Regions:
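Extended hydrophobic leader/signal-anchor segments used for secretion and membrane insertion
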Residues: 1-109
């Protein structure tokens, strides 16, 4: 099964404040093309399975340096160094508000 090019991201925590706030929802686009300044979803190198949202601040050879916009509240490349390209899963593109959950009514019931 093919992967969709977009995936939802729920922001949790304050490491990206004031740019992103906890509770916001964003769509991220899977892409190998990222650049300095992009806000990306990163597979956290210190904790397998943990995804974080950080800003790319510089390129370090073939790897990327990622940091939170709120340095006092962010665990990022300042702690664990640059991340591999494969650790960057996508780039945040657009903020959205999820619709409230509703049941689909049955017909003729």
């Amino acid at each position: 099964m093919a992967r969709l090019p977009w995936f939802p991201v729920a922001v949790a925590g304050d490491s990206m404040e004031p740019t992103l706030r906890s509770g916001e929802w964003w769509l991220a686009r899977r892409s190998d093309r990222v650049t300095v300044g992009d806000v990306v979803v990163v597979s956290q190198p210190e904790q397998v399975g943990l995804l974080t949202v950080k800003r790319i601040t510089r390129r370090d050879g073939t790897r990327w340096w990622v940091e939170g916009d709120n340095p006092d509240r962010s665990r990022d490349s300042r702690h664990y160094g640059p991340v591999d390209q494969e650790a960057i899963l996508g780039r945040l593109v657009v903020r959205y508000r999820p619709l409230p959950l509703r049941r689909i009514p049955r017909r003729g019931g």
